[in-house]
């Protein structure tokens, strides 16, 4: 049979963005694949070199625009490492941990729902998007924006709108989300058609993970026990002091990756509940006034006063801080976080000015996309949509 070449995307609904694949097919079996990326390139890393450190923060929301706050966290950790002000126990770190896990649920809900929709199950997308809408509302309540939050800041988060009512609502969301997860388990996990479409499809080995630099769910599905949140040396935020577990698979196939994502959402709910308990029972209350008082003692934090607009000198100081930003002495650092897709890292090089000399982003989805030709070889064209869904790619962070 003569091999034929087919374009898959970039307009295909299962391409999850602007992905263009040139496929060589033998009948309906994929023999070769050529991936074309770069259709969403905006030069984000170069633009960061032209802005003060704080003003580069919103660029990270626009990389992987499904897991926004986790990427802000990586950038904040990089700046804090350069300033030598890394903190693991403060209240604002607990708030970051809580919103990181809310973001993880946000990402996995979309990944699983769209994956199911690609294969033909419509029910789960309605349940998942209802839960995502609630998380978007929490985003909006703390920072005014639903997607591009710009909520985290070096050595602090915007605590002005954090309230006991918000924490109560998040706890209520946790209970409802567990019900939704059990409904999704019932309709997908034990579904015969779903298992036939995923089991032994797109299997990868331990060696493939090392060769292609796979991290996160992709690596854990093969049995690699690597989770930055639980790593004794690479841990960050408040995860070291929390009680949770990380899940691994054995087969390295699409079904294992689906199960890991489902279980991770349950663990995220557990972590959020622990973070809220710590916030509400700690000696330092969670009121913005008391936290601002503690923050003002730090050297690299904006001095926030009630009367900063009543004094000329304080107004000038306030204006200079937010327009010029702080200067960081020459140094470099690499800081990574466990994003929903894998290890999201930021390499930051400072040269003594108020702008980064270089900011390099390590996006996990870029590495995961490279393994797609090997995963899809020998599979049917119909399985390709299942494979693209299971590697969970977003082109904002691939093309940057």
Curated annotation (Swiss-Prot):
- SUPFAM superfamilies, alphabetized: HydB/Nqo4-like
Catalytic activity from the UniProt record: a ubiquinone + NADH + 5 H(+)(in) = a ubiquinol + NAD(+) + 4 H(+)(out)
Q: Which residues form the signal peptide?
A: none
- InterPro entries from the UniProt entry: NADH_Q_OxRdtase_suD, NADH_UbQ_OxRdtase_49kDa_CS, NDH1_su_D/H, NiFe-Hase_large
Q: In which domain of life is the source organism classified? A: Eukaryota
Q: Which Pfam families match?
A: Complex1_49kDa (PF00346)
Would you tell me the Gene Ontology cellular component terms? mitochondrion
For this UniProt entry, the molecular function terms from Gene Ontology, in alphabetical order, are: NAD binding; NADH dehydrogenase (ubiquinone) activity; quinone binding
Q: What is this enzyme's EC?
A: 7.1.1.2
**This protein's UniProt keywords:** Electron transport, Mitochondrion, NAD, Oxidoreductase, Respiratory chain, Translocase, Transport, Ubiquinone
The text of the family note is: Belongs to the complex I 49 kDa subunit family.
Job description of the protein: Core subunit of the mitochondrial membrane respiratory chain NADH dehydrogenase (Complex I) that is believed to belong to the minimal assembly required for catalysis. Complex I functions in the transfer of electrons from NADH to the respiratory chain. The immediate electron acceptor for the enzyme is believed to be ubiquinone. Component of the iron-sulfur (IP) fragment of the enzyme. Component of the iron-sulfur (IP) fragment of the enzyme.
**What protein am I looking at?**
NADH-ubiquinone oxidoreductase 49 kDa subunit
**Quick one: which gene encodes this?**
NAD7
């Amino acid at each position: 049979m003569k091999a034929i070449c087919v374009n898959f995307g970039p307009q295909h609904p299962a391409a999850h963005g602007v992905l263009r694949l040139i496929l060589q097919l033998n009948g309906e079996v994929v023999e070769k694949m050529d991936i074309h990326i770069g259709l969403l390139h905006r030069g984000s890393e170069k633009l960061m070199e032209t802005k003060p450190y704080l003003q580069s923060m919103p660029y990270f929301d626009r990389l992987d625009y499904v897991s926004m706050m986790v990427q802000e966290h990586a950038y904040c950790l990089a700046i804090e490492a350069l300033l030598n002000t890394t903190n693991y126990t403060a209240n604002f770190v607990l708030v970051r941990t809580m919103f990181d896990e809310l973001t993880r649920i946000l990402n996995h809900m979309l990944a699983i729902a769209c994956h199911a929709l690609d294969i033909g199950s419509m029910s789960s997308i309605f349940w998942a998007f209802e839960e995502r809408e609630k998380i978007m509302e929490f985003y909006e309540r703390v920072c005014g924006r639903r997607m591009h939050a710009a909520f985290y800041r070096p050595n602090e988060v915007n605590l002005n709108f954090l309230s006991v009512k918000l924490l109560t609502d998040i706890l209520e969301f946790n209970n409802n989300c567990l019900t939704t997860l059990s409904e999704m388990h019932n309709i997908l996990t034990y579904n015969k058609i779903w298992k036939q479409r995923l089991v032994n499809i797109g299997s990868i080995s331990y060696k493939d993970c090392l060769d292609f630099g796979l991290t996160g769910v992709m690596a854990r599905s093969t049995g690699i026990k690597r989770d930055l949140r639980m790593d004794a040396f690479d841990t960050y935020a408040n995860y070291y002091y929390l009680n949770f577990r990380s899940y691994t698979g054995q087969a390295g196939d699409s079904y294992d990756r689906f199960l890991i994502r489902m279980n991770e959402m349950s663990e995220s709910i557990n972590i959020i509940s622990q973070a809220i308990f710590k916030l509400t029972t700690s000696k330092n209350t969670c009121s913005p006034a008391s936290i601002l008082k503690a923050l003002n003692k730090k050297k690299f934090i904006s001095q926030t006063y009630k009367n900063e607009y009543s004094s000329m000198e304080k107004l000038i100081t306030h204006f200079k801080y937010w327009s010029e930003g702080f200067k960081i002495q020459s140094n470099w650092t690499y800081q990574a976080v466990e994003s929903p897709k894998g290890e999201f890292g930021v390499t930051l090089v400072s040269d003594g000015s108020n702008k980064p000399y270089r900011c390099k982003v390590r996006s996990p989805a870029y590495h995961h996309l490279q393994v797609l030709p090997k995963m899809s070889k020998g599979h049917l064209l119909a399985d390709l949509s299942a494979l693209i869904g299971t590697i969970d790619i977003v082109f904002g962070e691939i093309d940057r």
